[in-house]
A protein has these predicted regions:
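Active-site charged/polar residues at nucleotide-handling catalytic sites that mediate phosphoryl
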Residues: 131-135
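Structural motif
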Residues: 90, 136-138
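Conserved AMP-binding/adenylate-forming core of the ANL superfamily
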Residues: 46, 50-104, 121-126, 130
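Short acidic active-site motifs
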Residues: 7, 14-16, 123-124
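Structured binding elements
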Residues: 110
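Short beta->alpha connector loops at strand-helix junctions that form conserved
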Residues: 116-117
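A short N-terminal helical cap/helix-turn-helix that marks the beginning
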Residues: 2-9, 28-51, 69
Length: 138
């Protein structure tokens, strides 16, 4: 089975095993969420993709199949609420696993993710919303 990266990267090595050439072969329709995460969800569904540990020590493990399924659910929820390709979505979440699900979901839709820390002040949020011409806030 060809490694996923081999579809998108051509590497050449010399006799000493040193990389001598690297070429990126990224098609115009490349989508990390579909082409990598979902492909891993099909090839290695039970392999761990994310291990998240909360501030209270709570542990949550996501396999690639989980990440594929949950990002599909989130993408469908965003679409049902009007988010479409090209929309700018600012995401303000504490360090939480939901950030990664939302990231993959927006990637699948073709929306533009604008990450922002939850530690900003009101004036900072207002500035970002206006400067980025934000369509949606999470």
């Amino acid at each position: 089975m060809v490694g996923i990266h081999e579809k998108y990267v051509t590497e050449k090595y010399n006799a000493d095993g040193e990389l001598t050439e690297l070429k990126i072969n990224c098609p115009d329709n490349y989508n990390f969420a579909y082409d990598v995460i979902d492909e891993l969800g099909r090839r290695s569904p039970d392999k761990k993709a994310i291990i998240w540990i909360g501030e209270d020590g709570t542990e949550k493990i996501f396999t690639y199949a989980d990440l594929m399924r949950e990002s599909n659910r989130a993408a469908n929820m965003f679409i049902a609420n009007g988010v479409k390709k090209g929309d700018k979505v600012i995401c303000i979440l504490k360090r939480h696993y939901q950030f990664w699900i939302i990231t993959m979901a927006l990637c699948k839709i073709g929306a533009v993710l604008i990450p922002a820390t939850n530690q900003l002040k009101k004036k900072d949020y207002i500035y970002r919303f206006k400067a980025a011409d934000v369509d949606y806030i999470v």
